[in-house]
Amino acid sequence: MADTQPAQEAPAADAPRAERNFGRGRGGRGGRGRGRGGPGEEKEWVPCTKLGRLVKAQKVTSLEEIFLFSMPIKEHQIVDTLIAEGKLHDEMMKIYPVQKATSAGQRTRFKAFNVVGDCDGHIGIGARVGKEVSLAIRASMIAAKLNIVPVRRGYWGNKIGEPHTIPMKVTGKCGSVAVRLVPAPRGTGIVAAPVPKKILEFAGVEDVYTSSRGKTRTHGNLIMATFYALRKTYGFLTPDLWADTEPSRDPTDEHGELLAEMTTA
């Protein structure tokens, strides 16, 4: 007796994975990555700190207002918001494996150094360790934005045109490495090794002499020593900064009522 049941159609070879309903991967139904939020999805920033709420409400509109009151930056989105899109540059300076001896043997992780800057007086360095290269790079980039500091620029001689060099000699030290920055005349350029030169370019310094001593082959210490030297440019009060200034209120105090409304909302 012939079989009268209709034959079932086989799924097409080029059918998408979501239609096959295989449910593979951590994303579960619909393909790998959907359950975790794929890389193309960007969540809206919800500030967690008072400073973040003021930045999102456009009550604080520049990094100089934050540095004036020495307010800590706890969210990297603050830097992304205050620096115009396309002006903030980042670059991986160094990444290498590090090991730790445990009871189960050697545990290998990766340490990354990242630099961010707008080439206009702001520079940040971040160093983080991760189990994977991508995790270490992302963590170091976030740390660099949280560690961003202002760089004061000045003149070598007459005050003509825009500031082009550092205003005084400064020295930064990390480990056995010491980096000294010396002001240079306009047109000199950055006289430095490749690693400090990249950091000085990101800081917006056009002309400077440099000298270094110690174990400069340890690039991590060389990077941090250059960063510490640039950070010291705001550690001196030169005569042009001796003028009296009127004190102003802290942004968190000035906009206290707005912050209270945001908290209760």
Swiss-Prot record:
Residue intervals of the S5 DRBM domain: 88-151
SUPFAM superfamilies found in the cross-reference section: dsRNA-binding domain-like, Ribosomal protein S5 domain 2-like
Bias type Low complexity, positions: 1-15
Biased composition (Basic residues): 26-35
One GO molecular-function entry: structural constituent of ribosome
Residues covered by region (Disordered): 1-44, 245-265
GO process annotations (BP): translation
Listed Gene3D superfamilies: 3.30.160.20, 3.30.230.10
Family: Belongs to the universal ribosomal protein uS5 family.
UniProt protein name: Small ribosomal subunit protein uS5
Species, as recorded: Leishmania amazonensis
Organism classification: Eukaryota, Discoba, Euglenozoa, Kinetoplastea, Metakinetoplastina
